[in-house]
């Protein structure tokens, strides 16, 4: 049992109120002006924000098969430090969770080592990136969160349509990395001014938007919840906006780096700036920000993609795609958008908590009496530099090295258990 004393909570209007919070038996038992500590532990939250634990539906934990990049343990330690209490792990592992047996093995490993809640995806196709569909029903029974071939797009419309019909029958979501392989052209960055300046092959916007346009029509026909991963282009935003207006059940996420950076920020041919989708144009970034504010884009997800140093500290042509994000998402977004008054604090918290929970019908993401005690304590005055040497993640691959941010998670509770406190994993 914990009593969080003298903290602040956001009310429904987005105003800060001074409150104490009682955690008992893994639940939020009481939120009140003052709670007397008669047993359990007192946690001093003076001057700090007590918020729901963050939810990230797009995380690469790499285990099994990629333990040199990340493990379930290190990835969930990173999540705890970043204030995340629920993360959803992508299936581009070896082996792929494409069968009941592999999924059950993965679930056992999660139960054994994870520091926060991990909800694993199953793949859409066997081995991921094929045209043979998995056994959707068996994988749902084994605990799959949803179905995705993230890392690659499902190339054949017929394969995707059949997958959507099967998912819809089970009331499960299809989550899509949208990329038409015939339109990538071997690109390593956005097909724009940086690619031209550096003489690099570029990935055009249409590689993403064409597949989203196809998929929203398939989702409409199948009656399926279709979720777009890491949306990155103005055309994609337009397609999703039109689909929502048409009543199609489509949701979308955007990553912090696509909101903060564009291709003009890339300093040179450095693999730590290589990600998929790539950093796009200024116009694309503006469309993402507009789409998030008008509800076209539903929430924020990190696409945390750790790699070993030797896979990133090379030119872009040789580097792996992806950057880490779990430990830096909140401070970056708070600094860039809340401190600058572009967003309210409530908007940011909602996009990291209740919005993803609502999209995927998760019973998390709220701080209220009776809710699961997934809680992050945030020091909105704390100022620190982003230093990969302090990361719990094995991946140190971030383009934000050295950036000064204000507003950091200082403690995280997962189902009432203190898992991170003042720089230390419990």
Swiss-Prot record:
EC numbers for this chain: 3.5.2.3
Gene3D superfamilies (alphabetical): Metal-dependent hydrolases, Urease, subunit C, domain 1
GO biological process: 'de novo' UMP biosynthetic process; purine nucleobase catabolic process
GO MF, one example: allantoinase activity
Known cofactor(s): Zn(2+)
Residues the entry annotates as binding Zn(2+) 1: 58, 60, 150, 303
GO CC, any one term: cytoplasm
Active site, per annotation: 303
Residues noted as binding Zn(2+) 2 in the record, renumbered to the chain: 150, 177, 230
Record PANTHER family: ALLANTOINASE
Family label: Belongs to the metallo-dependent hydrolases superfamily. DHOase family. Class I DHOase subfamily.
Protein name: Dihydroorotase
Gene: pyrC
């Amino acid at each position: 049992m914990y009593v969080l004393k003298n903290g602040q909570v956001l009310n429904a209007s987005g105003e800060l109120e001074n409150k104490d919070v009682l955690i008992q038996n893994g639940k939020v038992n009481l939120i009140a002006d003052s709670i007397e500590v008669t047993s359990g532990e007192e946690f001093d939250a003076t001057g700090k924000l007590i918020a729901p634990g963050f939810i990230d539906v797009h995380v690469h934990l790499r285990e099994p098969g990629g333990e040199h990049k990340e493990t379930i343990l290190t990835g969930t330690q990173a999540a705890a430090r970043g204030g995340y209490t629920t993360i959803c792990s992508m299936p581009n592992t070896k082996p792929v969770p494409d069968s009941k047996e592999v999924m059950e093995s993965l679930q056992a490993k999660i139960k054994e080592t994870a520091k926060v809640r991990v909800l694993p995806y199953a793949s859409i196709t066997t081995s991921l990136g094929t045209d043979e569909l998995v056994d959707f029903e068996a994988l749902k029974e084994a605990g799959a969160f949803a179905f995705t071939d993230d890392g690659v797009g499902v190339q054949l419309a017929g394969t995707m349509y059949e997958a959507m019909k099967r998912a819809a029958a089970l009331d499960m979501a299809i989550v899509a990395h949208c990329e038409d392989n015939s339109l990538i052209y071997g690109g390593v960055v956005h097909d724009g001014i940086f690619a031209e300046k550096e003489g690099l092959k570029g990935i055009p916007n249409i590689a993403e938007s064409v597949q989203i346009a196809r998929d929203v029509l398939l989702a409409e026909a199948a009656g399926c919840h279709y979720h777009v991963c890491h949306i990155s282009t103005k055309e994609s935003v337009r397609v999703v906006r039109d689909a929502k207006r048409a009543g199609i059940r489509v949701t979308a996420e955007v990553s912090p780096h696509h909101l903060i950076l564009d291709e003009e920020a890339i300093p040179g041919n450095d693999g730590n700036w290589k990600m998929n989708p790539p950093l796009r144009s200024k116009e694309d970034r503006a469309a993402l920000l507009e789409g998030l504010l008008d509800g076209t884009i539903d929430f924020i997800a990190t696409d945390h993609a750790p790699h070993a140093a030797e896979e990133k500290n090379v030119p872009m042509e040789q580097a792996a795609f992806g950057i880490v994000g779990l430990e830096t998402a909140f401070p970056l977004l708070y600094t860039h958008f809340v401190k600058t008054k572009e967003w309210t604090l409530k908007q940011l918290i909602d996009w990291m908590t209740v919005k993803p929970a609502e999209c995927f019908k998760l019973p998390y993401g709220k701080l209220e009496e009776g809710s699961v005690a997934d809680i992050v304590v945030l020091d909105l005055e704390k100022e620190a530099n982003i230093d990969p040497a302090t990361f719990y993640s094995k991946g140190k691959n971030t383009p934000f090295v050295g950036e000064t941010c204000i507003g950091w998670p200082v403690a995280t509770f997962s189902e009432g258990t203190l898992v991170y406190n003042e720089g230390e994993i419990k």
